[in-house]
Amino acid sequence: MRSKALCGLMSVWVLLVTVPLWAHHSPSAIFDMTKQISVTGTLTKVDWINPHIVILMDAKGEGGKVENWKFESNPPSWYRRVGVTRADFAKAIGQTITVGGVRARNGTLFGYLLMIKMPDGTQLDLVVGDIK
């Protein structure tokens, strides 16, 4: 009987530990995956860090006001596997890029990157499927 109780407690513990981990690794926890956006602007900074690369860009919003956007992306290892390096992003700083992604649920100028079009016209799709 004691081993059944211990097994039950361990099962509950595993569920309690793994559910938050799953939520952390799910973009839909932070981003509204149904609200795709496209932003064109100037790439200002790239944080080439784990666990996710972050790009910062300035884009003109309503009324011509400059908005400071932040997009989270895949990890550096993913980019290396597809042949994109930190230097590729460094060359693009100060130039115009277009990104497609999904916006944060809280409505801030924060998104999850699904596509990036570099200044030379090269487009990199970070997901499989239809990106609007």
What residues fall within each predicted segment?
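Positively charged n-region of N-terminal signal peptides that target proteins for export
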Residues: 1-4
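Bacterial N-terminal signal peptides
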Residues: 7-20
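Short boundary/loop segments of OB/S1/cold-shock single-stranded nucleic-acid-binding domains
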Residues: 22-37
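Conserved hydrophobic positions within beta-strands
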Residues: 41-43
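Short aromatic-glycine-enriched beta-strand elements
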Residues: 49-60
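Short, basic/aromatic beta-hairpin or loop at an interaction surface
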Residues: 65-78
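Short nucleic-acid-contacting surface segments enriched for D/E, G, S/T with interspersed K/R
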Residues: 81-99
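OB-fold/S1-family single-stranded nucleic acid-binding modules
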Residues: 102-129
